[in-house]
Amino acid sequence: MMQSTKVTLLKACSLLFALCVLTNFANAQTTTGSLNDLSFLEGHWKGTYNGGPIEAGWTAPEGNNIMGYIRMIKDDKPALYEVFAFEPGEKGPIARVKHFKPGLIALEEKNVSDTYNFIEAKKNQALFEKDDVSVRIIYERRSQNQLVIQRGKMEDNKWVFMDLFVFTRVP
């Protein structure tokens, strides 16, 4: 009789465990995003980087894209241009970035761009990961007039982020 009770109890516990797992699985939501999750980027921004001024601008979401740029100046001359296109993907926006030296000389091949895939978004913040999984980027509007881009690298099996660009809104 005791053995039969143990078997029945074990079956009941197993069934309860399976129901809990299935319920949690059914309630799990895949994180997807939209271009509207990036609307906080919109505007004209300025900052300082590597001893010189930087300037950035992003459009509002329209026509299934957001366009942006960063212009870096060193010694009163252009040092680097970055052009961004955020476009919809299966799981959320995909960021494509091209880099240019002065004279619009591309650093990437003609048909190649750095591609960053959407991971998640919160209010005024979005996280992307580079295709080769070597870098993560956080876009974050910390206040109405401050926008920060952070770069993350894997260190000791965890992502460590540092501010890369800190911008102030241009009125």
PLM features: residue spans?
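Bacterial N-terminal signal peptides that target proteins for export
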Residues: 2-14
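Boundary at the C-terminal end of the N-terminal hydrophobic targeting segment
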Residues: 26-28
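Exposed beta-sheet edge/beta-hairpin loop segments within beta-rich domains
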Residues: 128-129, 137-140
